[in-house]
Amino acid sequence: MAGASAKVVAMLLSLQGPXSLRMVSESG
């Protein structure tokens, strides 16, 4: 299941931008 979530997150990040990557890094 984690794999599916990762794919969704990756898609959202690609849409939002690098910025989002920082937020995810802090969360994950």
Swiss-Prot record:
Keywords: Cell wall, Cell wall biogenesis/degradation, Membrane, Secreted. One of its GO terms (cellular component) is membrane. Residues 11-28 form the Expansin-like CBD domain. One of its GO terms (biological process) is cell wall organization. The keyword Cell wall biogenesis/degradation applies. It is a peripheral membrane protein. May cause loosening and extension of plant cell walls by disrupting non-covalent bonding between cellulose microfibrils and matrix glucans. This is Expansin-B1. It comes from Pseudotsuga menziesii. The lineage of its organism: Eukaryota, Viridiplantae, Streptophyta, Embryophyta, Tracheophyta.
